[in-house]
């Protein structure tokens, strides 16, 4: 994994979501070229994977807490 990819994975969920919203706005602009749209799409794909990872971590933590409560 590249250094850039490692740094990207440390992006907080909220920051990734904000950037995704920015990308959507940019892609909806008629002045955005096809090549730029592709680059933005690739960035968005990576950000979505990061968001999914954050969500999976939170779901796992919630399940763990729920299981602990059930055992009590």
UniProtKB/Swiss-Prot annotation:
Catalytic EC class: hydrolase
PANTHER family on file: EXODEOXYRIBONUCLEASE 7 SMALL SUBUNIT
Annotated protein name in UniProt: Exodeoxyribonuclease 7 small subunit
Keywords assigned by UniProt, alphabetized: Cytoplasm, Exonuclease, Hydrolase, Nuclease
Keyword flag Hydrolase: yes
Major place of residence: cytoplasm
Record's subcellular location: Cytoplasm
Family annotation (Pfam families): Exonuc_VII_S
Taxonomic path: Bacteria, Pseudomonadati, Chlamydiota, Chlamydiia, Chlamydiales
EC number of this enzyme: 3.1.11.6
């Amino acid at each position: 994994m590249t250094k850039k990819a490692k740094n990207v994975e440390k992006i907080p969920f909220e920051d990734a979501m904000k950037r995704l919203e920015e990308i959507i706005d940019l892609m909806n602009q008629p002045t955005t070229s096809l090549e730029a749209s592709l680059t933005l799409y690739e960035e968005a794909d990576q950000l979505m994977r990061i968001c999914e990872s954050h969500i999976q971590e939170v779901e796992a933590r919630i399940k763990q807490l729920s299981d602990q409560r059930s055992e009590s």
